[in-house]
């Protein structure tokens, strides 16, 4: 299954007269837009293909459901008032757009050299990124939204799975609620994990549905983390970054891991 074939399969499943499809061969993406609203979603095809090799039709079913939910929701009018408990931060790569297709600035903060924090209104099966127009219409200021979002992400349950490889311990947060990567902003949780770690603490957010925390004891641990992060990055529906981060004194610093060597970016 290559990108062109996957593109055709998704188009066949989503065939509707009121939607348009644009395959970008260079970026390896498929954009689906509503003809009326001009709003839509962009799918990273390599991630879907990687999942297809493991899950076959289930991987396509998942992305089709995601697109249908997202585009159908775009016809609805959404408000922030009364929805305070549904506002969350989401982590995205620095290549992610900073404005909507209509040129409206999105609300975001710089996070690391590899990531940004955007703010979203949770809609159940999907979400809407908060933009400046939405804020102005409801007379909400940036700080109010950011404060609420940070509080809400700290309130999310955190279920951690553990795996050991060659003396190194890897912890995974993978609840698939759309905010696993966002839990990297839960500072009390990171501080709690830091107390458990006896080696070097590293973090990774390869895609939106996983947070990896590593207790690195030797060079093998760095190699395993790099391979693991790249694998998750390649298979994620919403990829973020294939780089990992050292966690020191509450700060995140991107690192390159090459073979048995690593260096700070």
UniProtKB/Swiss-Prot annotation:
- Which superkingdom does the taxonomy of this entry point to? Bacteria
- What Pfam families does its record include? DUF1444
Cited NCBIfam families: PRK13668.1 (NF010189)
Give the family from UniProt: Belongs to the UPF0354 family.
Q: What is this protein called?
A: UPF0354 protein GWCH70_2742
């Amino acid at each position: 299954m290559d990108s062109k074939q996957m593109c055709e399969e998704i188009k066949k499943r989503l065939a509707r007269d009121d939607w348009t499809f644009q395959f970008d061969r260079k970026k390896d993406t498929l954009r689906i837009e509503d003809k009326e609203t001009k709003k839509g979603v962009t799918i990273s095809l390599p991630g879907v293909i990687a999942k297809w090799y493991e899950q076959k039709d289930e991987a396509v079913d998942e992305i089709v459901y995601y697109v249908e939910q997202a585009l159908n929701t775009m016809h609805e009018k959404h408000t922030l008032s009364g929805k305070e408990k549904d506002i969350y931060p989401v982590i995205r790569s620095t290549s992610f757009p900073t404005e909507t297709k209509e040129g409206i600035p999105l609300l975001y903060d710089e996070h690391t050299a590899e990531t940004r924090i955007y703010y979203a209104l949770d809609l159940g099966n999907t979400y809407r990124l908060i933009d400046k127009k939405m804020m102005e219409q409801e007379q909400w200021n940036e700080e109010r939204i950011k404060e609420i979002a940070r509080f809400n992400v700290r309130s999310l349950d955190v279920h951690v799975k553990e795996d050991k490889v060659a003396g190194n311990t890897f912890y995974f947060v993978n609840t698939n609620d759309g905010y696993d990567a966002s839990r990297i902003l839960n500072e009390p949780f990171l501080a709690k994990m830091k107390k458990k770690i006896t080696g070097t603490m590293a973090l990774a957010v390869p895609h939106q549905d996983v947070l990896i925390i590593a207790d690195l004891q030797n060079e093998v641990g760095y190699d395993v983390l790099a391979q693991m992060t790249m694998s998750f990055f390649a298979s994620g529906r919403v990829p973020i970054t294939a780089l990992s981060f050292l966690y020191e004194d509450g700060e995140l610093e991107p690192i390159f891991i090459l073979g048995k060597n690593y260096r700070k970016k």
